[in-house]
Amino acid sequence: MLKREMNIADYDAELWQAMEQEKVRQEEHIELIASENYTSPRVMQAQGSQLTNKYAEGYPGKRYYGGCEYVDIVEQLAIDRAKELFGADYANVQPHSGSQANFAVYTALLEPGDTVLGMNLAHGGHLTHGSPVNFSGKLYNIVPYGIDATGHIDYADLEKQAKEHKPKMIIGGFSAYSGVVDWAKMREIADSIGAYLFVDMAHVAGLVAAGVYPNPVPHAHVVTTTTHKTLAGPRGGLILAKGGSEELYKKLNSAVFPGGQGGPLMHVIAGKAVALKEAMEPEFKTYQQQVAKNAKAMVEVFLERGYKVVSGGTDNHLFLVDLVDKNLTGKEADAALGRANITVNKNSVPNDPKSPFVTSGIRVGTPAITRRGFKEAEAKELAGWMCDVLDSINDEAVIERIKGKVLDICARYPVYA
């Protein structure tokens, strides 16, 4: 018989210690990785629930197992909330990740070998948008598009590539682009050649939900997102659409199950339902507005301190700092900031002379610090500290001084109070 008082600490001290150390790390480090965020205790409660015990292959009302009457309610709540939040008339909440949601879209809309137009990874795209090491690059004929000299999407080149290569699908979306995408323009280009427009809004879904960033759902044939990142829910994926045919929606459902997955993770779907409800609250909109304000505030300081920011600014939650002129690599910057308890990720910049394992830039995002309660003043102070470290990358005294400031501000703004 299982007893509810069973716990990891008493049973597996080695594992528990690592878990506790990670908890301390999150509280004592400033998190600036653009794809990371802190989810609410309500979401974690759902993920740690007995829903983890239930197999539920199929969809609500059409399961392959019995005993699904309550998990049907859970999944339907998540579906309905996703549709309401993003103005969609179709939602699939089962994908285990954003990449698996993207895989489902590819398999629903395309045949292996079909031509796809996707954003160049080196210009801000994502692995699943056509990287040769990913399924997308291995199974499909990928034609990349990118940004112009100003750091913004080159729509003229995109249109030229589309007319020349006649892709079956055009992908909008990014993992390291700080501008606003013109979804209507992308749909116009897709329609001109009879292609699908598929948008991966994983990075900006929270901003979209709050009305801070344009919603791609009215423009795209299909939209995917993760449920973490700016949306601040559990790690998982989501597929959305509006105005599509029943045939399209059946194809998408079949591409998720049984096409790419078996049983859904019902405890995660419950977490998604909680997060989607939280995203409808007025304070969520305030939070997302602050995310964007904090990113702009940080950019201002980097520019004042003589650092180059790709595209010269940001209109969302992230920005790229180009370190080529500073004779620094992203790897060096990442490591030095890490020693000061500031977590970023090294990132390739446009026309990067370094390999993806070294890079010439860092990506900075504000969802996590804003979740802690940082506003513009704290964001600017933090950006100044980062510049101090990068200006003196081999000076351990400077790094230790900044680390002390980081520990102090983390104590004042805990993740979980």
UniProtKB/Swiss-Prot annotation:
Changing residue 363 to A: It does not bind serine and glycine and shows no activity with serine as the substrate. It catalyses: (6R)-5,10-methylene-5,6,7,8-tetrahydrofolate + glycine + H2O = (6S)-5,6,7,8-tetrahydrofolate + L-serine; L-allo-threonine = acetaldehyde + glycine; (6R)-5,10-methenyltetrahydrofolate + H2O = (6S)-5-formyl-5,6,7,8-tetrahydrofolate + H(+). It is found in: Cytoplasm. The record marks 228 as: Plays an important role in substrate specificity. Changing residue 228 to D/N: Utilize substrates and substrate analogs more effectively for a variety of alternate non-physiological reactions. Changing residue 264 to A: Important decrease in affinity and catalytic efficiency. Glycine binds at residues 35, 65, 363. CDD domains: SHMT. It comes from the Bacteria. Its main location: cytoplasm. The modification N6-succinyllysine is found at residues 62, 242, 250, 277, 293, 331, 346, 354. Keywords: Acetylation, Amino-acid biosynthesis, Cytoplasm, One-carbon metabolism, Pyridoxal phosphate, Transferase. Changing residue 85 to A: Alteration of the dimer-monomer equilibrium accompanied by minor changes in the catalytic properties and whitout any significant change of tertiary structure. In the monomeric state. Catalyzes the reversible interconversion of serine and glycine with tetrahydrofolate (THF) serving as the one-carbon carrier. This reaction serves as the major source of one-carbon groups required for the biosynthesis of purines, thymidylate, methionine, and other important biomolecules. Also exhibits THF-independent aldolase activity toward beta-hydroxyamino acids, producing glycine and aldehydes, via a retro-aldol mechanism. Thus, is able to catalyze the cleavage of allothreonine and 3-phenylserine. This is Serine hydroxymethyltransferase.
